[in-house]
Amino acid sequence: MKHFKEFIQWCCEPQRLFVLFIVVLAIPNVALFFTEQQMTLWARICNVILPVSVYWLIMTLGHKPGKTIWILFPFVFFAAFQLVLLYLFGRSIIAVDMFLNLTTTNSGEALELLDNLLPAVIGVFVVYIPALVLGGFSWARGNQLEYSFIRSQRKYALAGIVAGALLTVICYATQRDYQVKIEMYPANVCYNLVLAAERAGETAGYAETSRDFTFNASAAHDENSREVYVLVIGETARACNFGLYGYERNTTPLLDKMEGVVTFTDVLTQSNTTHKSVPMLLSAASAEDYDCLYRQKGIITAFKEAGFHTTFFSNQLPNHSFIDFLGMEADDWKFIKKDAPKGANISDDELLFLVEKELKAGHQKLFIVLHAYGSHFNYKERYPESMSVFKPDNLTDAKYENKEYLMNAYDNTIRYTDGFLASLITLLQKTNSFSAMLYTSDHGEDIFDDNRKLFLHASPVPSYYQLHVPFLIWLSKTYREKNVEVHEAILQNREKPVAGNASVFHTMLNLAGVQTPYRADSLSVANRQYLIRPRYYLNDHNLPKSLDKIGLKKEDIEQFRRNNLVFP
């Protein structure tokens, strides 16, 4: 015990703590110097010297370093968060979407992820928790720095700030797009936090800002015909693992045999985050006009105005986001996980029972939106053991050495989705109605696919595997016979480049014959007027960026070419 106290006293020596605190705060800046290779060398050097010198100066503003480090606690949190993200994604700073994900990701998903990020979590605990504890001890003991030490260190810090300021001037002079709030950590993280707070406020005010909006929608199809249209939004499904897209494994044996299924080969998502991609799929918003989301209602309201009975069923938990708001515009809506026992693993097949009930209700005009859980990590929990076709699939830790197990489990989720969609189509066929189904996914997924060893999605810089998503349209025999022009347009457009988020709204309205001034047939793949447009991705600051401006690497571009996708 005596030796332990002596060790703590030695560690709490003010000058040692002064140096320790600067070092632990500087770790992310040093790490970013090596990870952000897209930045110029001057910018990366500046990103170390200026912020670290500012930390250095702040540490000289008080005599008690233990107190100062606790005052700087937000930056300690940012540092820990930043290092975990670097471990997960390999590059980039804490994005706006990452802050928003903290409020929209349910606890179950978070625990699944954290359980598989133990090395990173343990690492930041080992570095930052002891620093804070030692700071607390030092503060409680009243340990103070000598004035002579503070004065000398302040001179060094000011010299570093001057050097950093000069480097910043050089960056502004030599780089047209350079901005401190974008390029320099932690200034950029603070800026992103402010943006996240602003967006959260705007989202919370959606009911008010969209209150008086109307699509002025009407129905063009025969009012005496029974019509059923279904929009299925998948989760984390990537096109390259679907047998329908030429995957080496037979992951879609049922859809392969389904009559009336058309596969679109070149469809990209405009966001790799659920909380942005799904609202675009449920509305007229797109990367090019994302802000209309705050003013307009969604596709469900357009169908309601046209006389359809509308339903929204989700196998995900509500989280006070746009997904909830747009879904709750329906006549009937339900989040099936909400009332389930805590920890219950609800399969997507539960959605089919709700669909069957709606179909039996006999609505003349029916629009159904399903939000599935699809292929969301942890993959092994997305399907029953009886659907475990590809084995072994029992190791779930997010490690490169487990790639085979993870890929097997992921492929099993796609095969499960195949069965889910085939069952849904069978239900629609039994109605003998004028019906259609559109299925796509919000985004794809990285599964340690190449030497970058990327995993999951929602990374600040996306990859090919997160962008290329499945996009299927099924038309009933009755629909194909009565609306030959639409069927021919779908076949004509199946190999053209498509922005899934921009197209779904207009395609569904087109399929259902819903007329509104907000419908653009040039964006509908079910229309001969469909036009090929430049490809955009919605970046972290909600700005549309061309594919060649979002940081894709040579490995991604090679996959675009290998899969015959248009780039950029």
Label each region the model flagged:
Residues 8-20, 64-68, 301, 318, ...:
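Membrane-interface soluble catalytic domains
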Residues 160-231, 236-397, 500-501, 506-531:
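Active-site-proximal alpha/beta segments of enzymes that process anionic O-linked groups
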Residues 246-250, 433-434, 440-485:
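Histidine-centered active-site microenvironments of extracellular/periplasmic hydrolases
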Residues 1-185:
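Transmembrane and membrane-interface helices of multi-pass
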Residues 55-56, 353-356, 394-437:
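A long, amphipathic alpha-helix that forms part
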Residues 42, 179-180, 287-290, 341-342, ...:
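Active-site rim elements
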Residues 230-231, 413-456, 505-509:
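Metal-dependent active-site segment of extracytoplasmic phospho-/sulfohydrolases and closely related
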Residues 386-403, 479-489:
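Flexible internal linker/loop segments at domain or repeat junctions
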